[in-house]
Amino acid sequence: MFEARLVQGSILKKVLEALKDLINEACWDISSSGVNLQSMDSSHVSLVQLTLRSEGFDTYRCDRNLAMGVNLTSMSKILKCAGNEDIITLRAEDNADTLALVFEAPNQEKVSDYEMKLMDLDVEQLGIPEQEYSCVVKMPSGEFARICRDLSHIGDAVVISCAKDGVKFSASGELGNGNIKLSQTSNVDKEEEAVAIEMNEPVQLTFALRYLNFFTKATPLSPTVTLSMSADVPLVVEYKIADMGHLKYYLAPKIEDEEGS
């Protein structure tokens, strides 16, 4: 059987909020090393990859590997019934067609027990090649979310230009254009407020803001976000989940001749 207990249950609630608007259903791969999810979004434009390591859970047991087909909207609805302070336990028998979710209030006086039907999903795993990136920008996640939101009022796409001294986000549309430049910060007291850039060569790429705004729903998971870019390969937007793993989004750049469309 599979059983995982998470004292900080709010992490799971935040993960589902970050996934459910982009993906309708996905296969949760459960193994002794942890929980993994990989899925294209419903329009096959972006890819999501989630890792929650077993040691990040307070207790974790997995007797044999499971592939659980989950409707993320349904799971999100059930998790909304959990309080932010609740301890969440996930439980499934080896060949079960349901996943049990148990929410315990911290004072132990209230226990909620839900059972969610699982789905049969035929999922192909895509190999994501490890690679070096020309530009890696680490910045406050709230700042990235604000930039994507602000520029989506101007246009549908953002041009991200990365140089040694800073990173620039630009958008243009019928009402005009907007540019936001963040300089690399050298002496910030708090690491999560810093803008750090590792650059091998300058990069300028265009991305659909609609998808970036979906990705920024993961902002509550991490105070920082990392953007990894190289010419002609998908952008990686990574949110670290403290002591547990990460949530990565992949988005291919828009090709030059598409930009007018």
From Swiss-Prot:
Question: Which GO CC terms are listed, alphabetically?
Answer: centrosome; chromatin; cyclin-dependent protein kinase holoenzyme complex; male germ cell nucleus; nuclear body; nuclear lamina; nuclear replication fork; PCNA complex
Q: How does it assemble?
A: Homotrimer. Interacts with p300/EP300; the interaction occurs on chromatin in UV-irradiated damaged cells. Interacts with CREBBP (via transactivation domain and C-terminus); the interaction occurs on chromatin in UV-irradiated damaged cells. Directly interacts with POLD1, POLD3 and POLD4 subunits of the DNA polymerase delta complex, POLD3 being the major interacting partner; the interaction with POLD3 is inhibited by CDKN1A/p21(CIP1). Forms a complex with activator 1 heteropentamer in the presence of ATP. Interacts with EXO1, POLH, POLK, DNMT1, ERCC5, FEN1, CDC6 and POLDIP2.
Pfam families on file = PCNA_C (PF02747), PCNA_N (PF00705)
Q: What's the protein here called?
A: Proliferating cell nuclear antigen
What role is this protein assigned? Answer: Auxiliary protein of DNA polymerase delta and epsilon, is involved in the control of eukaryotic DNA replication by increasing the polymerase's processibility during elongation of the leading strand. Induces a robust stimulatory effect on the 3'-5' exonuclease and 3'-phosphodiesterase, but not apurinic-apyrimidinic (AP) endonuclease, APEX2 activities. Has to be loaded onto DNA in order to be able to stimulate APEX2.
List Phosphotyrosine occurrences by residue: Y211
> Where does cross-link Glycyl lysine isopeptide (Lys-Gly) (interchain with G-Cter in SUMO2) occur?
K164, K254
Originating organism = Bos taurus (Bovine)
Q: Does the keyword DNA repair apply?
A: yes
Ubl conjugation among the record's keywords? yes
Q: Name one GO molecular function term.
A: dinucleotide insertion or deletion binding
Under InterPro entries, the record lists: DNA_clamp_sf, Pr_cel_nuc_antig, Pr_cel_nuc_antig_C, Pr_cel_nuc_antig_CS, Pr_cel_nuc_antig_N
> Could you tell me which cysteines form disulfide bridges?
C135-C162
Q: Tell me which family the UniProt entry assigns to this protein.
A: Belongs to the PCNA family.
Q: What keywords appear on the UniProt entry? A: Acetylation, Disulfide bond, DNA damage, DNA repair, DNA replication, DNA-binding, Isopeptide bond, Methylation, Nucleus, Phosphoprotein, Ubl conjugation
List residues annotated as DNA-binding.
61-80
Query: Could you tell me which Gene3D superfamilies the record lists for this protein?
Result: 3.70.10.10
Explain the post-translational modification.
Phosphorylated. Phosphorylation at Tyr-211 by EGFR stabilizes chromatin-associated PCNA.
